[in-house]
Design a protein with these regions (language model features):
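Positively charged n-region of N-terminal signal peptides that target proteins for export
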Residues: 1-8
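Catalytic-site microenvironment of enzymes
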Residues: 4, 13-14, 21-347
Length: 347
Protein backbone atom coordinates (compact mmCIF):
# COMPACT_ATOMS: atom_id res chain seq x y z
CA UNK A 1 0.00 0.00 0.00
CA UNK A 2 2.90 2.38 0.81
CA UNK A 3 4.43 1.64 -2.59
CA UNK A 4 1.12 2.40 -4.35
CA UNK A 5 0.75 5.73 -2.50
CA UNK A 6 4.29 6.78 -3.48
CA UNK A 7 3.67 5.91 -7.13
CA UNK A 8 0.34 7.76 -7.15
CA UNK A 9 1.93 10.90 -5.69
CA UNK A 10 4.71 10.71 -8.29
CA UNK A 11 2.10 10.43 -11.03
CA UNK A 12 0.23 13.46 -9.72
CA UNK A 13 3.44 15.51 -9.73
CA UNK A 14 4.14 14.53 -13.34
CA UNK A 15 0.54 15.39 -14.25
CA UNK A 16 0.92 18.85 -12.67
CA UNK A 17 4.17 19.51 -14.49
CA UNK A 18 2.59 18.36 -17.73
CA UNK A 19 -0.32 20.76 -17.22
CA UNK A 20 2.06 23.65 -16.61
CA UNK A 21 3.98 22.79 -19.77
CA UNK A 22 0.75 22.73 -21.78
CA UNK A 23 -0.22 26.23 -20.58
CA UNK A 24 3.14 27.56 -21.68
CA UNK A 25 2.54 26.21 -25.16
CA UNK A 26 -1.05 27.57 -25.55
CA UNK A 27 0.19 30.66 -27.53
CA UNK A 28 2.54 29.45 -30.29
CA UNK A 29 4.85 32.02 -31.91
CA UNK A 30 4.36 30.44 -35.32
CA UNK A 31 1.34 28.81 -36.96
CA UNK A 32 1.42 25.03 -37.00
CA UNK A 33 2.12 23.24 -40.24
CA UNK A 34 -0.21 20.51 -41.48
CA UNK A 35 2.39 17.85 -40.62
CA UNK A 36 2.77 19.18 -37.09
CA UNK A 37 -1.00 19.19 -36.64
CA UNK A 38 -1.24 15.56 -37.73
CA UNK A 39 1.60 14.53 -35.39
CA UNK A 40 -0.15 16.27 -32.52
CA UNK A 41 -3.34 14.35 -33.15
CA UNK A 42 -1.59 11.00 -33.45
CA UNK A 43 0.76 11.34 -30.42
CA UNK A 44 -0.69 10.63 -26.96
CA UNK A 45 -0.84 13.59 -24.65
CA UNK A 46 1.40 13.73 -21.55
CA UNK A 47 -1.70 13.43 -19.39
CA UNK A 48 -2.65 10.17 -21.11
CA UNK A 49 0.89 8.87 -20.62
CA UNK A 50 0.79 9.66 -16.90
CA UNK A 51 -2.59 7.93 -16.60
CA UNK A 52 -1.19 4.84 -18.29
CA UNK A 53 1.88 4.78 -15.97
CA UNK A 54 -0.25 5.10 -12.85
CA UNK A 55 -2.66 2.40 -14.08
CA UNK A 56 0.24 -0.02 -14.65
CA UNK A 57 1.68 0.85 -11.21
CA UNK A 58 -1.65 0.04 -9.58
CA UNK A 59 -1.73 -3.34 -11.32
CA UNK A 60 1.86 -4.10 -10.21
CA UNK A 61 1.08 -3.09 -6.62
CA UNK A 62 -2.06 -5.22 -6.49
CA UNK A 63 -0.13 -8.23 -7.80
CA UNK A 64 2.67 -7.71 -5.24
CA UNK A 65 0.21 -7.39 -2.34
CA UNK A 66 -1.63 -10.53 -3.46
CA UNK A 67 1.67 -12.46 -3.53
CA UNK A 68 2.57 -11.20 -0.04
CA UNK A 69 -0.82 -12.32 1.30
CA UNK A 70 -0.30 -15.79 -0.18
CA UNK A 71 3.16 -16.05 1.41
CA UNK A 72 1.79 -14.96 4.79
CA UNK A 73 -1.00 -17.53 4.61
CA UNK A 74 1.57 -20.26 3.90
CA UNK A 75 3.72 -19.43 6.94
CA UNK A 76 3.12 -21.73 10.00
CA UNK A 77 1.78 -20.25 13.20
CA UNK A 78 4.73 -19.94 15.56
CA UNK A 79 2.50 -20.35 18.61
CA UNK A 80 1.87 -23.95 17.54
CA UNK A 81 5.58 -24.82 17.84
CA UNK A 82 5.94 -27.26 20.76
CA UNK A 83 9.60 -26.50 21.46
CA UNK A 84 8.64 -23.85 24.01
CA UNK A 85 10.64 -21.13 22.23
CA UNK A 86 7.58 -19.37 20.85
CA UNK A 87 5.33 -19.49 23.89
CA UNK A 88 4.53 -15.86 24.72
CA UNK A 89 5.20 -16.49 28.43
CA UNK A 90 8.31 -18.58 27.94
CA UNK A 91 11.80 -17.31 27.17
CA UNK A 92 14.19 -19.90 25.76
CA UNK A 93 17.27 -20.34 27.96
CA UNK A 94 20.63 -21.80 26.99
CA UNK A 95 21.29 -24.67 29.38
CA UNK A 96 24.03 -27.19 30.06
CA UNK A 97 23.74 -30.57 28.30
CA UNK A 98 23.86 -33.88 30.17
CA UNK A 99 23.60 -37.54 29.21
CA UNK A 100 20.90 -39.93 30.38
CA UNK A 101 21.58 -40.97 33.97
CA UNK A 102 24.30 -38.37 34.44
CA UNK A 103 24.70 -36.69 37.82
CA UNK A 104 24.33 -32.92 37.87
CA UNK A 105 26.22 -31.14 40.62
CA UNK A 106 26.30 -27.47 41.56
CA UNK A 107 28.86 -25.59 39.47
CA UNK A 108 30.43 -22.93 41.72
CA UNK A 109 30.69 -20.56 38.74
CA UNK A 110 26.92 -20.47 38.23
CA UNK A 111 25.06 -17.33 39.27
CA UNK A 112 23.99 -17.44 42.95
CA UNK A 113 25.88 -20.73 43.57
CA UNK A 114 27.92 -18.97 46.24
CA UNK A 115 24.72 -18.36 48.23
CA UNK A 116 24.28 -22.11 48.86
CA UNK A 117 25.30 -23.70 52.17
CA UNK A 118 24.59 -27.40 51.41
CA UNK A 119 25.67 -28.54 47.96
CA UNK A 120 27.69 -31.77 48.05
CA UNK A 121 24.83 -33.79 46.51
CA UNK A 122 23.73 -34.21 42.90
CA UNK A 123 20.57 -34.16 40.83
CA UNK A 124 20.13 -36.81 38.10
CA UNK A 125 19.22 -36.27 34.44
CA UNK A 126 16.82 -38.67 32.69
CA UNK A 127 16.24 -38.54 28.93
CA UNK A 128 13.05 -39.54 27.13
CA UNK A 129 13.51 -42.37 24.62
CA UNK A 130 10.75 -41.46 22.16
CA UNK A 131 8.98 -38.33 20.88
CA UNK A 132 11.57 -36.16 22.61
CA UNK A 133 10.56 -32.52 22.89
CA UNK A 134 14.01 -31.21 23.86
CA UNK A 135 12.50 -29.73 27.02
CA UNK A 136 13.91 -30.53 30.46
CA UNK A 137 11.49 -30.40 33.38
CA UNK A 138 13.14 -29.98 36.77
CA UNK A 139 11.20 -32.09 39.31
CA UNK A 140 12.03 -31.18 42.90
CA UNK A 141 10.69 -33.51 45.61
CA UNK A 142 10.37 -31.12 48.52
CA UNK A 143 12.41 -31.55 51.72
CA UNK A 144 14.63 -34.63 52.19
CA UNK A 145 17.98 -33.06 53.17
CA UNK A 146 19.39 -34.28 56.47
CA UNK A 147 20.88 -31.40 58.44
CA UNK A 148 18.94 -28.92 56.34
CA UNK A 149 17.47 -27.15 59.36
CA UNK A 150 20.83 -26.67 61.06
CA UNK A 151 22.12 -24.01 58.65
CA UNK A 152 20.61 -20.96 57.00
CA UNK A 153 20.84 -19.17 53.66
CA UNK A 154 19.82 -15.70 52.50
CA UNK A 155 16.13 -15.45 51.69
CA UNK A 156 16.92 -13.11 48.77
CA UNK A 157 20.10 -12.85 46.68
CA UNK A 158 20.46 -9.17 47.59
CA UNK A 159 20.13 -9.85 51.33
CA UNK A 160 16.81 -8.04 51.69
CA UNK A 161 14.11 -9.20 54.12
CA UNK A 162 11.17 -11.48 53.38
CA UNK A 163 7.99 -9.61 52.59
CA UNK A 164 5.53 -12.33 53.66
CA UNK A 165 5.44 -15.07 56.25
CA UNK A 166 5.78 -18.80 55.58
CA UNK A 167 8.13 -21.36 57.08
CA UNK A 168 10.20 -18.26 57.87
CA UNK A 169 8.45 -15.12 59.11
CA UNK A 170 8.20 -11.80 57.30
CA UNK A 171 11.13 -9.49 57.98
CA UNK A 172 13.73 -12.25 58.23
CA UNK A 173 16.77 -12.07 55.97
CA UNK A 174 17.79 -15.73 56.40
CA UNK A 175 15.84 -19.00 56.31
CA UNK A 176 16.69 -22.62 57.09
CA UNK A 177 18.49 -24.18 54.14
CA UNK A 178 15.86 -26.96 53.82
CA UNK A 179 12.94 -27.46 56.19
CA UNK A 180 12.00 -30.91 57.44
CA UNK A 181 8.41 -30.83 56.19
CA UNK A 182 5.26 -32.03 57.96
CA UNK A 183 3.77 -35.48 58.58
CA UNK A 184 0.45 -36.73 57.21
CA UNK A 185 -2.31 -37.72 59.61
CA UNK A 186 -1.27 -41.36 59.25
CA UNK A 187 2.30 -40.49 60.29
CA UNK A 188 3.88 -40.64 56.82
CA UNK A 189 6.60 -37.98 56.40
CA UNK A 190 5.90 -35.41 53.71
CA UNK A 191 9.38 -35.99 52.25
CA UNK A 192 8.48 -39.63 51.51
CA UNK A 193 5.30 -38.66 49.67
CA UNK A 194 6.96 -35.89 47.67
CA UNK A 195 9.62 -38.38 46.53
CA UNK A 196 7.00 -40.93 45.48
CA UNK A 197 5.08 -38.17 43.69
CA UNK A 198 8.28 -37.10 41.89
CA UNK A 199 9.01 -40.66 40.76
CA UNK A 200 5.53 -41.13 39.31
CA UNK A 201 5.64 -37.71 37.65
CA UNK A 202 9.07 -38.47 36.19
CA UNK A 203 7.81 -41.64 34.50
CA UNK A 204 4.81 -39.87 33.00
CA UNK A 205 6.86 -36.92 31.75
CA UNK A 206 9.40 -39.25 30.13
CA UNK A 207 6.58 -41.15 28.43
CA UNK A 208 5.26 -37.84 27.09
CA UNK A 209 8.65 -36.98 25.57
CA UNK A 210 10.03 -34.62 28.22
CA UNK A 211 13.48 -35.04 29.73
CA UNK A 212 13.47 -34.90 33.52
CA UNK A 213 16.00 -33.47 35.96
CA UNK A 214 15.31 -35.28 39.24
CA UNK A 215 16.56 -32.83 41.85
CA UNK A 216 16.13 -35.41 44.62
CA UNK A 217 16.37 -38.97 43.37
CA UNK A 218 16.44 -40.71 46.75
CA UNK A 219 15.40 -40.34 50.37
CA UNK A 220 18.14 -37.77 51.01
CA UNK A 221 20.05 -35.33 48.83
CA UNK A 222 22.60 -32.87 50.12
CA UNK A 223 21.30 -29.90 48.19
CA UNK A 224 19.68 -26.95 49.91
CA UNK A 225 16.90 -24.88 48.38
CA UNK A 226 19.35 -22.43 46.82
CA UNK A 227 21.45 -25.21 45.27
CA UNK A 228 18.34 -26.98 43.94
CA UNK A 229 17.15 -23.76 42.33
CA UNK A 230 20.51 -22.83 40.81
CA UNK A 231 20.92 -26.32 39.33
CA UNK A 232 17.48 -26.04 37.71
CA UNK A 233 18.37 -22.56 36.44
CA UNK A 234 21.25 -24.04 34.46
CA UNK A 235 20.17 -27.58 33.57
CA UNK A 236 16.38 -27.38 33.12
CA UNK A 237 13.76 -25.37 31.24
CA UNK A 238 11.48 -25.12 34.26
CA UNK A 239 11.47 -26.00 37.96
CA UNK A 240 8.51 -27.67 39.70
CA UNK A 241 8.79 -28.22 43.46
CA UNK A 242 6.31 -30.72 44.95
CA UNK A 243 4.86 -30.16 48.43
CA UNK A 244 1.86 -30.71 50.70
CA UNK A 245 0.92 -27.84 52.99
CA UNK A 246 1.53 -28.06 56.72
CA UNK A 247 -1.40 -25.80 57.58
CA UNK A 248 -2.72 -27.73 60.60
CA UNK A 249 -6.25 -27.92 59.21
CA UNK A 250 -8.56 -30.85 59.94
CA UNK A 251 -9.78 -31.14 56.34
CA UNK A 252 -8.26 -31.47 52.88
CA UNK A 253 -8.27 -27.97 51.40
CA UNK A 254 -7.00 -29.00 47.95
CA UNK A 255 -4.25 -27.98 45.56
CA UNK A 256 -2.76 -24.55 44.90
CA UNK A 257 0.48 -23.00 43.71
CA UNK A 258 2.63 -20.39 45.42
CA UNK A 259 2.32 -17.21 43.38
CA UNK A 260 4.74 -14.29 43.48
CA UNK A 261 3.83 -11.57 46.02
CA UNK A 262 3.91 -7.95 44.91
CA UNK A 263 6.60 -7.04 47.43
CA UNK A 264 9.35 -8.85 45.51
CA UNK A 265 8.24 -8.27 41.92
CA UNK A 266 10.68 -5.38 41.59
CA UNK A 267 13.68 -7.39 42.82
CA UNK A 268 15.94 -9.24 40.39
CA UNK A 269 15.85 -11.94 39.22
CA UNK A 270 12.15 -11.99 40.20
CA UNK A 271 11.36 -8.84 38.21
CA UNK A 272 12.45 -10.50 34.97
CA UNK A 273 10.73 -13.84 35.56
CA UNK A 274 7.74 -13.60 37.91
CA UNK A 275 5.20 -13.61 35.08
CA UNK A 276 6.65 -16.90 33.83
CA UNK A 277 6.50 -18.35 37.35
CA UNK A 278 2.84 -17.46 37.75
CA UNK A 279 1.95 -18.63 34.23
CA UNK A 280 3.51 -22.03 34.90
CA UNK A 281 1.70 -22.32 38.24
CA UNK A 282 -1.65 -21.39 36.72
CA UNK A 283 -1.18 -23.94 33.94
CA UNK A 284 -0.40 -26.71 36.44
CA UNK A 285 -3.53 -25.91 38.44
CA UNK A 286 -5.66 -26.02 35.30
CA UNK A 287 -4.20 -29.41 34.47
CA UNK A 288 -4.98 -30.68 37.97
CA UNK A 289 -8.49 -29.26 37.78
CA UNK A 290 -9.06 -31.03 34.46
CA UNK A 291 -8.24 -34.34 36.16
CA UNK A 292 -10.69 -33.81 38.99
CA UNK A 293 -8.27 -32.70 41.70
CA UNK A 294 -9.70 -30.47 44.42
CA UNK A 295 -8.48 -26.89 44.01
CA UNK A 296 -8.15 -24.53 46.95
CA UNK A 297 -9.88 -21.18 46.36
CA UNK A 298 -8.66 -19.51 43.18
CA UNK A 299 -5.74 -21.94 42.97
CA UNK A 300 -2.93 -19.70 44.22
CA UNK A 301 -1.47 -18.18 47.37
CA UNK A 302 1.17 -15.42 47.32
CA UNK A 303 4.19 -16.29 49.50
CA UNK A 304 7.79 -15.04 49.40
CA UNK A 305 9.85 -18.20 48.77
CA UNK A 306 13.61 -18.72 48.54
CA UNK A 307 13.03 -20.81 45.42
CA UNK A 308 11.21 -18.00 43.61
CA UNK A 309 13.73 -15.38 44.72
CA UNK A 310 16.64 -17.18 43.04
CA UNK A 311 14.92 -18.60 39.94
CA UNK A 312 15.85 -17.55 36.41
CA UNK A 313 13.68 -20.18 34.65
CA UNK A 314 9.90 -20.66 35.03
CA UNK A 315 9.65 -21.94 38.59
CA UNK A 316 6.82 -22.82 40.95
CA UNK A 317 6.09 -24.55 44.24
CA UNK A 318 2.86 -26.53 43.87
CA UNK A 319 1.06 -27.65 47.04
CA UNK A 320 -0.91 -30.81 46.29
CA UNK A 321 -3.01 -30.77 49.46
CA UNK A 322 -2.23 -30.99 53.17
CA UNK A 323 -1.88 -33.53 56.00
CA UNK A 324 -5.48 -34.66 55.50
CA UNK A 325 -5.05 -35.46 51.80
CA UNK A 326 -5.15 -38.94 50.35
CA UNK A 327 -1.64 -39.87 49.25
CA UNK A 328 -2.21 -43.36 47.85
CA UNK A 329 -0.50 -44.29 44.59
CA UNK A 330 -3.82 -44.09 42.75
CA UNK A 331 -4.27 -40.48 43.86
CA UNK A 332 -0.65 -39.61 43.07
CA UNK A 333 -1.04 -41.12 39.59
CA UNK A 334 -4.03 -38.89 38.94
CA UNK A 335 -2.22 -35.82 40.26
CA UNK A 336 0.74 -36.64 38.03
CA UNK A 337 -1.55 -36.82 34.99
CA UNK A 338 -2.84 -33.36 35.83
CA UNK A 339 0.67 -31.96 36.26
CA UNK A 340 1.78 -33.41 32.91
CA UNK A 341 -1.23 -31.78 31.25
CA UNK A 342 -0.24 -28.51 32.91
CA UNK A 343 3.33 -28.79 31.62
CA UNK A 344 2.04 -29.47 28.12
CA UNK A 345 -0.32 -26.52 28.39
CA UNK A 346 2.52 -24.22 29.39
CA UNK A 347 5.01 -25.27 26.72
Amino acid sequence: MKRFTAILLTGMMIFTLASCGKKAQDTPTEPETETQAVEKVEMPTETEAVTEVVTEAVKDTQQTEAQQEEQTAEQPDEEQNNSGENNSSYQYVERASYENGESVSLNPSWQYADHSAINSGCAVMYKATANRKNIVVGVNAGHGTSGGTSVKTLCHPDGSAKTTGGTTGAGATKAVAVSGGMSFNDGTPESSVTLRMAQILKDKLLAAGYDVLMVRDGSDVQLDNVARTVICNNAADCHIALHWDGDGLSYDKGCFYISVPGGIKGMEPVASHWQQHDALGASLIEGLRAHGAKINGNGSMAIDLTQTSYSTVPSVDVELGNACSDHSDATLENLADGLVQGVEGYF
